[in-house]
A protein has these predicted regions:
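Ribosome-associated translation termination/rescue signal centered on the conserved GGQ peptidyl-tRNA hydrolysis loop
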Residues: 1-107, 111-113, 124, 136-139, ...
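Helix-turn-helix DNA-binding helix
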Residues: 131-132
Length: 160
């Protein structure tokens, strides 16, 4: 699996590499949500361990896009590669299309430094405090980094 290729695909291209399933949503929302197939689930055909679903919207189209976004984030969180040399500068926001790839690269750098944020910051060419701000802006990333640090016997990072 070429992680960076998958993370850079458009929704249409990624959809072609997935099995898309649609079903009725659950919970509040009334007739539109409970009586039509608005919930979406995307399963990566190359590796069916990677699957994401969404039923937060009343639109099947938006739920499909959200499920694909969640799938990209899952791939970025779980698939580690050697960090790119030199590591890319992380400049985009959490809703930008390039964010999952940047997220994966940040985790690659952290993994290569045994989750030492100061060493990872030096590799990325930013200060440790700036690197922590990049990590802190995404709650799921912050939790992933802290759980990985704990697994290695390191203390949790604290937010300012």
């Amino acid at each position: 699996m070429d992680r960076d290729l998958l993370l850079g695909l458009s929704d249409e291209e990624l959809s072609a590499r997935c099995r898309l399933e649609f079903c009725r949503g659950t919970g509040n929302g009334g007739q539109k949500r409970n009586k039509t197939s608005t919930a979406a689930r995307a399963v990566l055909l190359e590796d069916e361990r990677f699957a994401a679903s969404d039923c937060s919207e009343r639109s099947q189209h938006r739920n499909r896009a959200n499920a694909l976004w969640k799938l990209r984030r899952l791939i970025a969180f779980e698939v580690r590669c050697a960090p790119p040399v030199p590591p890319p500068r992380i400049t985009c926001g959490v809703t930008h299309a390039e964010y999952p790839r940047n997220l994966a690269h940040m985790l690659d750098v952290l993994d290569s430094c045994s989750y030492d944020h100061k060493a990872a910051a030096a590799l990325c060419g930013v200060t440790p405090s700036a690197f922590l701000k990049l990590l802190r802006r995404d709650d799921a990333l912050w939790e992933k980094v802290n759980s990985s640090r704990e697994a290695l016997g390191l203390h949790k990072l604290k937010c300012n």
